[in-house]
Each structure stands twice: as C-alpha cells, then as structure tokens.
Amino acid sequence: MGKEDKTHINLVVIGHVDSGKSTTTGHLIYKCGGIDSRTIEKFEKEAEELGKKSFKYAWVLDKLKSERERGITIDIALWKFETPKYSVTVIDAPGHRDFIKNMITGTSQADCAILIIAAGTGEFEAGISKDGQTREHALLAFTLGVRQLIVAINKMDTTKWSESRFNEIIKEVSNFIKKVGYNPKAVPFVPISGFEGDNMIEPSPNCTWYKGWNKETASGKSSGKTLLDAIDAIEPPTRPTDKPLRLPLQDVYKISGIGTVPVGRVETGVIKPGMVVTFAPSNVTTEVKSVEMHHQQLQAGYPGDNVGFNVKNVSVKEVRRGNVAGDSKNDPPKGCESFNAQVIVLNHPGQVGAGYAPVLDCHTAHIACKFSELIEKIDRRTGKSVENNPKFIKSGDAAIVKMVPSKPMCVEPFTDYPPLGRFAVRDMRQTVAVGVIKSVIKSDKTAGKVTKAAQKATKK
C-alpha cells in the first residue's frame, strides 16, 4: 500500500498541562513521522547546548509550535506520522494559545482525541480535579462531535510500572469519561512512557502484566498492545462528499487577467468547474469557471481540499471572507435571521444574560451576535432541561440560547453541516463559551444578483 493510498485521519491531543502531551506527540512524530533526520539532529544539538537533552521529543514539538506561533509556515509534514493503515495529522495540541478556538473553527474536525493522563502520584489527581483542564478538553471534544477517544496513561515509569496504579487510574478515568458522554468499553486504555518510548510503538518489556487493550464498538471488537495499535484501530471517518456543497470563504482575491478568485476549504460536497454557485449571505449567484489547488487545475474539489476558484461577473466587493458558497441547485446556503444553539459557558468572570453581544467565530465568519433569549438551562451531559427561561447563566452552565447576528451571517444546524454548526464565543480576548447550533431561521430574501454567466450556464 503506497503512502498516497492511505486514508487520512486527524487527531487532537488533550490533557492537563503537565501530562506529557508534547513529549508523547513529539515521540510519535519523531519515530513514525515526517521529520527528516537532518532536522532532528539540528534540534538535538540545540537541545544539548541548552542542557535540555532529556527534553528531546518535547523540544521537537516546541520548536514546531514556536515557529507556528511566529507565523512561520511550517511544512505540515512535520505534524504528520504514519501508522500501518493511516496517514495521521495532529491538528492541534493544546497549550497552543488559541487551542479552543482552533478546535471549533479549526481547519478540520478531529476524527479521534487522545487523552493523555499522567500516572504520577498527585499528578493524576490534579489533572482530573473539578477545575482541571482535562475535564474541559474532554467535554469540548465530545460536544464538538469527536466521538472516538483513546486514553494514554503516561509517565508509567515514574510509578515503577505499577499494575495496581494503572488499574486504579482506569477505574477513575472510566467514570470520568462516562460523565462526559463517552462509553469506556469503546475506549482503549494504554500504559505508556512518552519519554522512554515504552508501549508507544513496540510493546514494552517493563510491564509484563499488561495483556493489551480491548475496545468494543458498533462495528465490532478490536485489541492491541501499543498506542500506535490503538491509533491504527480508529474507525475510518466518512467524508461528506454526498452532502450539498458548503465552502466557507477564507479570502477573496482579485487576480489580474483572471478576475475574482474566492479561496476556502470544501467542508461538504464537491465543487466543479461549470457549476452554478450561490454565495450566502450576500445572495450572489454565478458560474464557477475553474477550480485549482496548489496552482493545479482540478476537475473537482472534495471535502478537506483548500481550493481557489474563479468566478465570472462578480467583483471583490460582492463576496467576502465569512461568506459561504454552495450549489445553487442543491440546498443553496442562505443568510439567517436568528438561530438556536446549545451554548456552554467555559470561563466568563460574571453572569451572562439576555442582551449579551459578544463576537462569534463560526467557520470563517467573525460576527457579533446577541443572546436575545435564554430559552432553557440544560444538563451538559444528558441535554435534558433543568430550568426554563433562566435569568442568567455562568461558567460551567449549558443553555439553549436564541442568537441574533448583528449583520448577515450564514450558519447551519450542526447535525446537517457540522463545520458550519459549531462556534466559539470570544470576549475579553479569550474563548468564553462554545456553541453547537440546533436550528436556524433562514432569511428568505427575494432573488439576489444572478450574473449573466450563471444565466447562460443554467440554460445549457
């Protein structure tokens, strides 16, 4: 099986700040990944000079992260590694400033989350305590539709590979993830040392008692020994090619001699030359002349592809970042009057009531929206109502809220088009809440602009 034929999957790595996420991720990328040996030698030398030899794997990741944060575009291959079955991209590791926002508006939906738990005495308890980040990250992953989970119990070397400690942690973590919404039976629990490399890629001689992990899902049972095995046993994602087209615009360029070129990622459906597309909420309809990716003409752009496409008779002023392109003949996108969403308040210093109007980041749109009505407060895990029309909600609460955008905006219910149905609420320079859209009241404006090119193409 050639490298090119492997299915791509996206992983997100979650866990408490000192659980060893960087070291573990660094180790996988280092051993199975896209970092060439020259780069590694350079990093190792730098680490040694700084007396950070022990820090080798995390150092690899730190270097990548700091370059990423400084805006140096890194070869994305550095964040990739291979398993026998998959080509894996680590889409984000927390600790990154905008982790929560990235996870929501993020370039891609994670197919699976790896929760890293530190086994050390006191460490485990701190990570999983009431206010722990671990709980928040796990809840976020679940709320945002990441349905597969792997638990890696790290730093087992610091517990002298104690079987009883491992079992104690499994018991606690099973209860914990059950409360979040995951089924522990479907989750592999793997004891590892991200630093020493035990059980990461090859079974470790240090835990002879460990018989391996098992998981049982709707599609059957699987088992294995290592973290790599567990990643290889992730169920392959279905990519939404059969849904109608949704393509949120990241930018719109004017290119001399070519014209207007919107750019963005195909989230669902397929975009092809000759197709007549409608942009929402600007309500402009026109023909796609050509589609390209990395300066190559494409016959079609599929979910996950970052494409540029050339449109006729449309000026740069008429379509902009945050607009969404769709097929004019197949459930075309529309602007919305309002939408109802399940909102979870993460960290807001005060109370949130009706009238609150923060900025929402939803796909590529960045628009202020008013919480016009708090419909009901709900239990985060079950979704059941606990109070009708609450006056306020505060950190930790979840509620169904009616939201009204301050200017035209295109969103969709999460169940129909997931990437257009989740959002981050930004205020005070941080993510204060996240939301999942339940229903949308679309604005049925009278016909907008239909270009000559579109009329011609429709007649064909």
Swiss-Prot record:
One term under GO cellular component:
cytoplasm
- At which residues is N,N,N-trimethylglycine found? G2
* Domain tr-type G: start-end pairs: 6-241
Q: Which residues carry this modification: N6,N6,N6-trimethyllysine?
A: K80
Region listing for G3, in residue ranges: 92-95
- N6,N6-dimethyllysine PTM sites in chain numbering: K3, K317
Q: Give the span(s) annotated as G1.
A: 15-22
Q: Where in the cell is it found?
A: Cytoplasm
CDD domains documented for this protein: EF1_alpha, EF1_alpha_II, EF1_alpha_III
Q: Name one GO molecular function term.
A: GTP binding
> At which positions is GTP bound?
15-22, 92-96, 154-157
**Segment G4: which positions?**
154-157
State the HAMAP family in the record.
Answer: EF_Tu_A (MF_00118_A)
Q: What does this protein do?
A: This protein promotes the GTP-dependent binding of aminoacyl-tRNA to the A-site of ribosomes during protein biosynthesis.
Q: Which family does it belong to?
A: Belongs to the TRAFAC class translation factor GTPase superfamily. Classic translation factor GTPase family. EF-Tu/EF-1A subfamily.
What is the protein name for this chain?
Elongation factor 1-alpha
Q: Which gene encodes it?
A: TEF
